[in-house]
């Protein structure tokens, strides 16, 4: 595989057909994102089916990610649908259910008057409009407009620095989570994570449904930045969701949060996605800005497992051009750039084995690293090292293969169950010698666990020549 960093594409009206989704797969989409902030369950179900059909037809492993809306706080509705707040004006945000006027509008967050205090900031529509609380008057929060602009029905409201009392999962999120699990998605992304304990609520619902899949923590809140290391440990992967993050924390901090998050995720062998406005201008244009190209390349050079497209593919004028453009930028960054080495000394058996396998393969100038895995853990531990060698991953579990679509560099093969090391090598020979890329006697460094099939039991490195008789 020429490109090692994976691409996540958000599905939406711009690609709402089987042919369009198949073309995304052919263009290079590795993970399809179902955004539950928009669309009906029927829309997501249809897109899910089209992705699975496309993967069956093309043979590519593509994961499917269900992104939950989270407890998003919004304004209510205006009598006229919209208004313009001018800087210096006084407006009231109320917890009462009222039809909004220019001077007073409701909010979906019914504890606002209880939680707000003078001096707190309220940011509307991703920070385009700024307010500051001057006083709390009964059920109303009286605000001065510090940065004016247009506001309209149901615009989002961010409350940076305010200690808000909302659950990690709304009723809508729970319903969407149940639906997505029954549908068969490969990942769940949890929005507005504040604490490592937030994952427990998701697991409770998963256990009720009877199906667990990896949970991705979206870094959007200051609390998540403060608890970053413990959140990385608790969750299965993380997403640096720079849109809401850039509203909730000072904008100048976002690049360093991104770099720190990627570093911590790599140290813990957890996949990390960099998201939001990566090629945003391509929603309307055929070419990205130079700054956007640099942004994508820098995410690659930071060591991200994946980069994500949002509106660019869901509502953009040419989603296929966007994916191809991102793929070219990524490939060039990988070819001519340099990802800093992981300066992390492994302390576990699995970590030491993975490091050693990489070192042996590179010192012997092997053709590839090969990982056998039942859970994906072995592959992720090797992938985080970003070797220049191909990483070929064999698994008997179709779900694990789909989940590894998010892991840097993992080229996956679905194989039969094996019961011995000899069988492993036979599977490698059968699969790779059938490809034009590999020849008999090519050296492979295989990392796996014995006995095979035991999750988390990485304990073996085997230097194998393709086609050799492994029996002694």
Q: Residues of each region from the PLM?
A:
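Non-catalytic helical/linker scaffolds that mediate oligomerization, partner binding
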Residues: 1-472
